[in-house]
């Protein structure tokens, strides 16, 4: 057993969350005029665009509600979550409880509700806030959204799907991954527990029996929606190591919930195969996208190093170690921990950078934008704090 000071690691992540990350979002992201949150924040927290992206609205509600429920009953956190939820409730969705992709500052829709992930993060937000407030209204909203997600699951984009029907129908890995996590989030408020278990079973089957390719040691981002088979095209060859590792720690939680040690061991084994494939052996860090055959990429950002990829991977590795004691997981966590704090942490301003080039140099100094908001950094800091603290108790 190596001498790793888990208590010091836990303290470092807790301090970063409480003193650096959360104050940044509380101070700079809240729109005190129209409600909701600004996510387009520059390095120093100044707002550079006022459009509101519904994924990130829901994620920030969830974040502060979750911390209120699990860390401390901080009234500032709860007030932040409630005002964001009220904005979403009033402006975020159409009459069918489909959530728009983006709104202008005042809450008028900008982009149609084509993206089902707007629904999934709204569902998580209202479910977590229902726990924090005891509000039956928020619980009912979460249940309505969950039902709508299940209705849309087989054709998530619906009328806004741009693919020509029938030629090459595909389904993507991200949806079962997110639903897998969402199921645990809303367990306490669901009235029909059978639907919950069926949803979890379906997601586990989809991820492990359809998207996961044992001979490749990774999940494919897209497979045929007709028979679940791999497709030899740009989308079909695409792998995203960060997505894989995020899904794997979600499923480790399901393994814990079900007391399934064999499942946990399998997930840890897969996670090690994924990270070994995804790691950039020349410059360090994890590639954003890879082609399963090593063919040229269609996505120009394939070799960038992104904040969420490394944070989610660190969670997967530390959780794998905590659950199984596998030293390879610990080795990878320590390597990722060093990479995160060396490359993504801003030494001059709060919050972390999101986008690096392949060499690990900062590409964009923003702290928030269309895709980066109050989610992966604070959730990751919280998760790694808790996991390290748990490992420290076992020393």
Describe the predicted segments one by one.
Residues 1-395:
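Glycan-recognition and catalytic cores of secretory/periplasmic carbohydrate-active enzymes
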């Amino acid at each position: 057993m190596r001498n790793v000071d888990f208590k010091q690691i836990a303290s470092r992540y807790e301090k970063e969350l409480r003193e650096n990350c959360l104050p940044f979002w509380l101070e700079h992201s809240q729109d005190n005029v129209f409600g909701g949150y600004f996510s387009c924040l520059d390095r120093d927290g100044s707002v550079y665009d006022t459009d509101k992206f519904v994924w990130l609205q829901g994620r920030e509600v969830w974040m502060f509600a979750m911390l209120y429920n699990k860390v401390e009953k901080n009234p500032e956190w709860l007030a932040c979550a409630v005002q964001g939820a009220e904005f979403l409730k009033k402006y975020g969705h159409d009459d069918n409880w489909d959530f728009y992709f983006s709104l202008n500052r005042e809450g008028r829709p900008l982009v149609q509700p084509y993206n089902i992930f707007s629904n999934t993060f709204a569902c998580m937000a209202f479910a977590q806030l229902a726990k924090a407030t005891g509000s039956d209204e928020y619980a009912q909203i979460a249940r309505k959204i969950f039902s709508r997600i299940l209705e849309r699951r087989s054709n998530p984009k619906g009328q806004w799907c741009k693919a020509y029907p029938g030629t090459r129908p595909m389904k993507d890995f991200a949806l079962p991954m997110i639903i897998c996590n969402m199921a645990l989030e809303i367990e306490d408020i669901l009235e029909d527990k059978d639907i919950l278990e069926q949803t979890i079973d379906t997601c586990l089957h989809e991820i492990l029996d359809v998207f996961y390719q044992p001979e490749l040691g990774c999940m494919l981002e897209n497979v045929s929606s007709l028979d679940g088979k791999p497709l030899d095209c740009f989308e079909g060859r695409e792998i995203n190591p960060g997505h894989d590792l995020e899904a794997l720690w979600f499923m480790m939680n399901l393994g814990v919930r079900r007391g399934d040690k064999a499942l946990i061991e399998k997930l840890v084994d897969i996670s090690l195969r994924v990270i070994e494939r995804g790691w950039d052996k020349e410059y360090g860090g994890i590639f954003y996208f890879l082609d399963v055959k090593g063919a040229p990429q269609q996505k120009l950002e394939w070799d960038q190093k992104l904040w969420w990829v490394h944070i989610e991977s660190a969670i997967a590795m530390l959780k794998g170690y905590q659950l199984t004691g596998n030293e390879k997981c610990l080795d990878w966590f320590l390597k990722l921990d060093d990479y995160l704090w060396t490359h993504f942490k801003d030494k001059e301003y709060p919050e972390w950078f999101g986008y690096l080039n392949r060499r690990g140099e900062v590409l964009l100094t923003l702290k928030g934008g269309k895709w980066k908001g109050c989610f992966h950094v604070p959730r990751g800091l919280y998760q790694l704090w808790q996991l390290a603290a748990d490992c420290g108790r076992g020393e």
